[in-house]
Amino acid sequence: MKDHLIIFDTTLRDGEQSPGASMTREEKVRIARQLERMRVDVIEAGFPAASNGDFEAVKAVAAAIKGSTICGLARAIEGDIRRAGEALRGANSARIHTFIATSPIHMEKKLRMSPDQVVEQAVKAVKFARQYTDDVEFSPEDAGRSDITFLCRVLEAVIDAGAGTVNIPDTVGYTMPQQFGELIRTLRERIPNSDKVIFSVHCHNDLGLAVANSLSAVMNGARQVECTVNGLGERAGNASLEEVVMAVRTRQDFFPCDTRIDSVHIVPASKLVSGITGFPVQPNKAIVGANAFAHESGIHQDGVLKHRETYEIMRAEDVGWGANKLLLGKHSGRNAFRSRLAELGIELESEETLNATFMRFKELADKKHDIFDEDLHALVSDDAAALQEHYKLLSLTAHSETGETPHASIVIGEEGRESRAESDGSGPVDATFRAIEKILNSGVELQLYSVNAITSGTDSQGEVTVRLQKSGRIVNGNGADTDIVVASAKAYLSALNKLHSKLERAHPQV
């Protein structure tokens, strides 16, 4: 029987550190439920000590998820670990992931601690974490630049202290695959008690090698890979969950292990994360890109038509690609609507939320003849965003005519008050944004504006992503509507609502 390769997803923690990718508590729970359906082994839900928002998000995920282990990150200090333990109290299966830097430069310049003090602190942290859960993971931050002998000493000590998993991060994405594989093999050979622990890896993609390094580590004995959906993460991102899983699954002739991932949920997870974060997936992205299974060359097309395996090494349907399934229309009832949401893995928290979302569906069905699965995902995302609204779009009129200056008139609700403004602009979207700013005077800088059609057809909903920056903070906002100008206003206000509600948090470099 092959070894089990544990998939540790950190989309909700490390993935959220992408500039602009901040998620609300409800959004984190939605993604966590999709990861649970995918049968992800461990979900790192956040860094509870970073902020009250992070604490509550980890607590909510821990309460909602029963089929995956829920993990909270903590520095190797008692306050962080206590906070993580409290956030995870409601979890069916909980893990605390604690870390401390072990490289000479970090110990000297950042921690101002001697090597002996670092070992002592790491051991204390693991023992303290064991008071909250038997499942403790330890990471030596900046392992790639750490002295190998000292690294072995630290890891041996934390294993003796009760760590069940030791995670080796390539924090700055500098290591080559052969080097990283050799590092894992060396640690397993030199640490006397290495047989009592699972070796994990956490690779960053600064040189485009995160997946390659992770797979090299697996070939050298690592049995947990830390990764994110779509490779999301700060700088160039993390190892991509879908690429790691499908590389191991497709090359079972090569790898001595396999995951328990239900791969048909990969594409839905990719779309969900992309929609919530506002980070589109590049068309040529392996596994989940729109062109991943497209064949332009006539020779390739002919081969695929005759025998799929000529140019396809895996089946599109095995990762969740399927026909754009026609779903519902204006005559569809509430039960059919609820049933289709359940099939898509969308769970609404209450009957009240279901009723409100169904009414929005009926409004959309009046504008759009055919409703597809993608429309429902966008609809639910819009409704989830509405729950966090401080600023609410009440009405919008935009006018654009050839040879005339575009004009917009808008009404925004804020804590029960209504504010109105009008503005001209270089286009209807520009006029709308200017009108919003006349009311709110937010002082933000628009960094990104993008539009994507959710489905095909001239009556398709447009999904707009807006990225705003203010005082060094970056947020993304999304909006969907059959009217692009309305979708743009929704996206702009969505981003402003995130700026209004989100607090700054400390982001660890693990």
UniProtKB/Swiss-Prot annotation:
Enzyme class: transferase
UniProt region (Regulatory domain), positions on chain: 392-510
Gene3D superfamilies membership: 1.10.238.260, 3.30.160.270, Aldolase class I
A biological process from GO: L-leucine biosynthetic process
Catalytic activity, as annotated: 3-methyl-2-oxobutanoate + acetyl-CoA + H2O = (2S)-2-isopropylmalate + CoA + H(+)
Listed CDD domains: DRE_TIM_IPMS (cd07940)
InterPro entries: 2-IPM_HCS-like (IPR050073), 2-isopropylmalate_synth_dimer (IPR013709), AIPM/Hcit_synth_CS (IPR002034), Aldolase_TIM (IPR013785), LeuA/HCS_post-cat (IPR054691), LeuA_allosteric_dom_sf (IPR036230), LeuA_bact_synth (IPR005671), PYR_CT (IPR000891)
GO molecular function: 2-isopropylmalate synthase activity; acetyl-CoA C-acetyltransferase activity; manganese ion binding
EC number, as in UniProt: 2.3.3.13
One Pfam family linked to the record: HMGL-like
Location(s), subcellular: Cytoplasm
Residue numbers binding Mn(2+): D14, H202, H204, N238
Family membership: Belongs to the alpha-IPM synthase/homocitrate synthase family. LeuA type 1 subfamily.
Subunit and partners: Homodimer.
Protein name from the UniProt record: 2-isopropylmalate synthase
Taxonomic lineage: Bacteria, Pseudomonadati, Pseudomonadota, Betaproteobacteria, Nitrosomonadales
Gene responsible for this protein: leuA
